[in-house]
Amino acid sequence: MNTPKVNILYSPGQAAQLSRTLISTCHTRPFLLGGLRVATSLHPTQTNLSSSPPRGFTTTSVVRLKDFFPAKETAYIRQTPPAWPHHGWTEEEMISVVPEHRKPETVGDWLAWKLVRICRWGTDIATGIRPEQQVDKNHPTTATSADKPLTEAQWLVRFIFLESIAGVPGMVAGMLRHLHSLRRLKRDNGWIETLLEESYNERMHLLTFMKMCEPGLLMKTLILGAQGVFFNAMFLSYLVSPKITHRFVGYLEEEAVHTYTRCIREIEEGHLPKWSDERFEIPEMAVRYWRMPEGKRTMKDLIYYIRADEAVHRGVNHTLSNLDQKEDPNPFVNDYKEGEGGRRPVNPALKPTGFERAEVIR
């Protein structure tokens, strides 16, 4: 008796990929804005939804929806822990973060501040923010509200673009200080680790938002161009004046705190209903990285965590700009002397304008 011939239509790997795609189509449905594919997961908690599969919103056809960077399965490795584990935040610390501005005192400060304002203007254009959605230009240092709120998709466009660039300064500064330490045959006194950790933290912000959406060709092109220009500009500026560069980054992080504060306000005011929904699920990688407790895993909670991180970068860079760039140790990684005359700086997130040199070095 002849055995019928069986045609293999796909490999085991393709079958696994197909199954993941089918699962994702059962949990999400799409929507599209400016080349950005958004996939926000909701889970049923209400009685009338308990029999239905989780729904969500994206911007492309369902069959194309997939994890933008799925974890690669290996025979032995279960997961890769973060190189710099997050120390975590208390609710009190996160709530106490406020938008603040350090007034320029020198020509270098003024130059750094004006460059940040130009970058803010360019970012508004690149991310499609309309005039009525921009904050009060008469109070650019503290304004966190606008005539018209952004949508969830617009916020994700802005977050992706900003965080793709925000991870550049720390890496550039850390790299140059590493090379400087090798050339001088001297220790760096703790600056390199803090700068690289800052860059890593910004990248984790980006990867978290990337779990919610996938950039299109236009966004990828904008990111490529912006990163190329920004990296080289930071490289040259840090060679010329590290002090002004750190001040620039401090002002840049001020803008980040303003941005996330505005997002929190719009969530609280009900302008972002998808993110206010109790069924909304933030990415699991965010829960693990920030060690977010049960009951504190909403989108607003996630933004609180990220804003606190940005507040740290704000305080750290303003402080580093106040120090002797070649000789002073990094005050945020050193143990301080106890007793009379000894000082221990408070959390940099709570020092918006940074510490003066006399407060941490003497």
Swiss-Prot record:
Its EC number is 1.-.-.-. It comes from Gelasinospora sp. (strain S23). Its cofactor is Fe cation. The chain crosses the membrane at residues 156-176, 222-242. CDD domains: AOX. Binds 2 iron ions per subunit. GO terms for molecular function: alternative oxidase activity; metal ion binding. Keywords: Electron transport, Iron, Membrane, Metal-binding, Mitochondrion, Mitochondrion inner membrane, Oxidoreductase, Respiratory chain, Transit peptide, Transmembrane, Transmembrane helix, Transport. Fe cation 2 binds at residues 202, 253, 310, 313. The keyword Endoplasmic reticulum does not apply. It is an enzyme of class 1 (oxidoreductase). Catalyzes cyanide-resistant oxygen consumption. May increase respiration when the cytochrome respiratory pathway is restricted, or in response to low temperatures. Belongs to the alternative oxidase family. Pfam families: AOX. GO terms for biological process: alternative respiration. It comes from the Eukaryota. It is a multi-pass membrane protein. PANTHER family: ALTERNATIVE OXIDASE (PTHR31803:SF3). This is Alternative oxidase, mitochondrial. Residues 1-64 form a transit peptide. One of its GO terms (cellular component) is mitochondrial inner membrane. It is found in: Mitochondrion inner membrane. Fe cation 1 binds at residues 163, 202, 205, 310.
